[in-house]
Amino acid sequence: MDSPLAIIVLAAGKGTRMKSDLHKVLHPIAGRPMLMHLMASAAELSPARQVVVAGHGREQLEKALGGSADIAVQDPQLGTAHAVQQAQGALSGFEGDVLILYGDVPFVRASTMRAMIERLHGADEPAAVVLGFAPADTLQYGRVIADDGRIVKMVEHKDASEAERACRVCNSGLMAVRSADLFGLLARVGNDNAQGEYYLPDVVNIAIADGRTCAVVVTDDADEVAGINSRGELAEAEGRWQQRRRAAAMADGASLIAPETVWFAWDTVLGRDVTIEPNVFFGPGVTVGDNVTIHAFSHLEGASLAQGVEVGPYARLRPGARLEEKVKVGNFVEVKNAVLHKGAKANHLTYLGDADVGAGANIGAGTITCNYDGYFKHRTVIGERAFIGSNSALIAPVRIGADAIVAAGSAVSRDVADGELRMVRAEQLVKPGWADRFHDAMKKKKAEKKS
């Protein structure tokens, strides 16, 4: 494809069925707004221009896009053809191909987009290329009546004859058109219909009436053009995405003990021979090395796990957690913005926040890095091979030296030197026989109350 490409994404709908203050196309699937799934696929075609047509929630879209696309505004919303017209200003001076997509149809593959553009440059030079699909139930969809891939006409279901309804190729709404043709055709679209709106498929019928060829490309996967208009459809889309990602993970060498209970993010990276037990959740930003085991009920986000790491069960890795080779983070351990160097262990009931844990260090059960003073975060540094006894509080900023030992139950607020033992406890009080006398006195008092 030598011709420059522009992408128009229609996202002006109110999304009323979502019943949400968040713009419909910004609802996440696998931890990523559905619009950004679509934009990422489109980016594989290296478009020269990108325009998102917004209406309701424009400010949210601008923030999410961060300047990566121009924003055109459709107000009022008068149909899909009218929406595309609003991009004309943003495409002023552009000469090339235009691909029209929908923000609530997020899983169109780059290969499908590419096939549409390639068909636009076919020998018969079609004026427009429509993406068709064959759903299991064609009842609600307009039909693409075609002969050998050339469109005869586009017809809405309610207007179709019985013979036309027998056609299984339906209109996805996606279209590829040359910029030289697009806006001239749009200007001729009327609104003589029950809704009084301007519909994009009419572009095809107008071009055909002019004697131009229009073509259809039919996807082999109806799910890729499934629209999302409600919370239920959002959940279904999430389920389909997760099912495919799980299958891909296992095909790439990961073992998922109960695949249907594992939830991945859009950018999860897994190495070879990774074992994932049931009910594990990956948020965005997780990279897992080879030969890692993640035990049941663990929650990971923004974390990197090197080769041979073992996590969980019931562990939580938060953003900034970095576990180097052979690290063990066990049950009910939380790690945030902390590095555990090679072979370090925190096996149970521990919080490590804003910490640097040296290679081979052992963190006992119940250890807490006290990293927040109510205003600022502070860092704890634990040296190589240090041993932190159970139920210890390390009050940051503090440094524990290499090979040092912190006795169980200590609250450490000053640095500990290399090889030092630090014990910070109140002196034990011993009173022989006191408990016996206490019990005797209480029993006597209880008996007196009953009498």
From Swiss-Prot:
Q: Where is this region: Linker?
A: 232-252
What cofactor(s) does the depicted protein rely on? Answer: Mg(2+)
Catalytic activities: alpha-D-glucosamine 1-phosphate + acetyl-CoA = N-acetyl-alpha-D-glucosamine 1-phosphate + CoA + H(+); N-acetyl-alpha-D-glucosamine 1-phosphate + UTP + H(+) = UDP-N-acetyl-alpha-D-glucosamine + diphosphate
Concerning Pfam families, the annotation shows: Hexapep, NTP_transf_3
Q: Where is this region: Pyrophosphorylase?
A: 1-231
The UniProt annotation places Mg(2+) binding at 104, 229
> Can you tell me which residues bind acetyl-CoA?
365, 371-372, 390, 408, 425
Alphabetized PANTHER family for the sequence = BIFUNCTIONAL PROTEIN GLMU (PTHR43584:SF3), NUCLEOTIDYL TRANSFERASE (PTHR43584)
Q: What job does the chain carry out?
A: Catalyzes the last two sequential reactions in the de novo biosynthetic pathway for UDP-N-acetylglucosamine (UDP-GlcNAc). The C-terminal domain catalyzes the transfer of acetyl group from acetyl coenzyme A to glucosamine-1-phosphate (GlcN-1-P) to produce N-acetylglucosamine-1-phosphate (GlcNAc-1-P), which is converted into UDP-GlcNAc by the transfer of uridine 5-monophosphate (from uridine 5-triphosphate), a reaction catalyzed by the N-terminal domain.
**Protein's name according to its UniProt entry:** Bifunctional protein GlmU
Protein's organism: Novosphingobium aromaticivorans (strain ATCC 700278 / DSM 12444 / CCUG 56034 / CIP 105152 / NBRC 16084 / F199)
Q: Top-down, what is the taxonomic lineage of the species of origin?
A: Bacteria, Pseudomonadati, Pseudomonadota, Alphaproteobacteria, Sphingomonadales
